[in-house]
A protein has these predicted regions:
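An acidic/histidine-cluster motif and surrounding catalytic segment
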Residues: 1-117, 127-157
Length: 157
């Protein structure tokens, strides 16, 4: 089972997705049947923010005084997460912060949800220890992102 906690800091999110919490909870349902979690109780949170909030967090935790599209804060170190998923029944993965304005800017007309889905999936994979530091890691992560994205696109929210 996957539990996702959604917090909305910027009101503009609801202009594009009327109920973001329900939307995300509906989207993650399919992951229960995947082999990523092997029937574990998984929890993570998403903060739907704007430029101001994400810039402040980026500066505070990464010492980068600029806005960004996404921040991921894994609860476990990269080399610990796979062991935790294998051995623990309940796991808190961490936090994802998404920037409405960066997503809106990158999304083409009527493709806000598509861009939003790509980004939260990307963040979730970071919480699971996936990185894109090398070409090999990049392609491995991208392949999994695309597979999950295709599954979420089939769901109706």
């Amino acid at each position: 089972m996957i539990k996702i906690d959604v917090f909305i800091k910027d009101k503009n999110w609801k202009k594009h997705i009327s109920n973001p919490a329900k939307y995300l909870k509906d989207k993650v349902k399919f992951i229960n049947s995947s082999t990523l979690f092997n029937k574990k109780y998984i929890n993570f949170s998403i903060l739907l923010a704007g430029n101001k909030e994400i810039k402040m967090l980026n500066n505070k935790f990464r010492k980068k005084n600029k806005t960004t599209n996404i921040l991921s804060f894994p609860f476990y170190k990269r080399n610990e997460i796979k062991k935790k998923i294998k051995n623990e029944d309940r796991i808190y993965l961490g936090d994802i912060i998404l920037n409405f304005y960066k997503i809106k800017k990158k999304a083409r007309k009527n493709e806000f949800e598509k861009e939003f889905n790509k980004l939260w999936i990307h963040g979730l994979l970071h919480l699971l220890g996936y990185q894109h530091d090398t070409n090999k890691d990049f392609y491995k992560m991208r392949k999994l992102e695309n597979r999950i994205f295709k599954q979420t696109e089939k769901t109706e929210c």
